[in-house]
Amino acid sequence: MSLSNSLGLLGRKVGMMRLFTDDGDTVPVTVVDVSNNRVTQVKTEANDGYDALQVAFGARKASRVTKPAAGHLAKAGVEAGEILKEFRVTADVAGKYAAGTVVPAADVFAVGQLVDVQGTSIGKGYAGTIKRHNMSSQRASHGNSRSHNVPGSIGMAQDPGRVFPGKRMTGHLGDVTVTTQNLNIVRIDEARQLLMIRGAVPGSKGGFVTVRAAIKAKPTTAAKGAN
């Protein structure tokens, strides 16, 4: 499923735990709360030039909502959310929902499905090139003095006489948007609207994430045989 026609869900990273299979194997999973994903606007080709669903998640105080946003949400009949995101979908998918509809997890995902999870990575603060870019340390001795954990030369001579843009150097590590691809949904708790996704997802506990169908998922053997 391509990125342009897949509905996703917004959620909050609850934390990690493990599940046990019937064979006794342990599976590490990340629990993502995707409850109360509500549609705030349905965009159509006729009115907006493309088909999309605008979805809100979380809760925000009324005093923290701007007047234009408050009017937009009041028109849809939904409460303000902490985050608002738009998903490009097909006309068929857009026609299934109306403004104010709560999208359940089972409507979008299924157990065994591969998904991409996007979030903000944990900030690590100012870091050197070894930690930030996985560079190697220099020699501990044999002529090396006070240059053990530095990157070394960052340029050339008088020509070009400058450091090229994009040179990997020290700086802020983390706190950037990261997408982890092709993660498997192990279980869906429909009662509590929780997704249990195998492996780790970006961000810290309590961080917001976006879950959508994997765009680089390889077809299964059964699907190949069907073709």
UniProtKB/Swiss-Prot annotation:
GO MF annotations in UniProt: rRNA binding; structural constituent of ribosome
GO BP term, pick one: translation
Record has Chloroplast as a keyword: no
Xref: Pfam families: Ribosomal_L3 (PF00297)
Gene3D superfamilies found in the cross-reference section: 3.30.160.810, Translation factors
Keywords assigned: Methylation, Ribonucleoprotein, Ribosomal protein, RNA-binding, rRNA-binding
GO cellular component, one term: cytosolic large ribosomal subunit
PTM characteristics: Methylated by PrmB.
PTM sites of type N5-methylglutamine: 158
Alphabetized HAMAP family for the sequence: Ribosomal_uL3_B
Function: One of the primary rRNA binding proteins, it binds directly near the 3'-end of the 23S rRNA, where it nucleates assembly of the 50S subunit.
Family note: Belongs to the universal ribosomal protein uL3 family.
Subunit and interaction comment: Part of the 50S ribosomal subunit. Forms a cluster with proteins L14 and L19.
The name this protein goes by in its record: Large ribosomal subunit protein uL3
Species of the source: Polaromonas sp. (strain JS666 / ATCC BAA-500)
